[in-house]
Amino acid sequence: LLTFPGKYWKDLTLAALIFTAVTVWMQRDMLQLTQQADNFVLPGLSTASAAILNPGERTLVYFFAPWCNICKLSIGNLSRLNDELHTVAVALDYKNAQQVATFVGDRELKVPVLLGNSQVAAAYQISVYPSYYVIDGQGKVLGRSAGYSSLAGLLWRTQKI
């Protein structure tokens, strides 16, 4: 067991409380757990149109904007998730498909990227980037989060569900 002077425990506790409060605040407008998520067919960045969700398959849906600095740091973690979870990235709030293609190419993303729109953003209640949902095979929200997530954080959130 690590021992820290009392001051450090107070600092760590305060940091944890602030992190938790910010996370809860960022998720306040997102779809609620067990809520039904809409499935949209969207144009793919490098493929034909595809549905966001695959019926019968658990899916991680990661919403990002190509100008988002936090997205730049965290989106690469999607490529390292295991193959047991269908993963799709949905671009929102972009100028054109080339802007998204440049963003994705610079990060060598290996998951399907779909080009979303304001209707998708409204249906999934996206107000901050990045935002992501874990959705079950019947379209119900199992988990949600917003902001930076490390690979360990993504694995923990997707495996615990």
What are these regions, as identified by a protein language model?
Residues 104-138:
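Short, internal strand/loop/helix patches
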Residues 1-43, 161:
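N-terminal targeting signals for export/organelle localization
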Residues 56-58, 83-86, 111:
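Loop/turn elements at helix/coil->beta-strand transitions in domains of secreted/extracellular proteins
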Residues 135-161:
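Thiol-/selenol-based redox modules, centered on thioredoxin-like
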Residues 35-57:
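Short extracytoplasmic/periplasmic juxtamembrane "stem" segments immediately C-terminal to an N-terminal membrane anchor
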Residues 49-72, 78:
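Short active-site neighborhood of thiol/selenol oxidoreductases, capturing the structured segment around
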Residues 72-107, 116-122:
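Structural microenvironment flanking redox-active thiols in thiol-disulfide oxidoreductases
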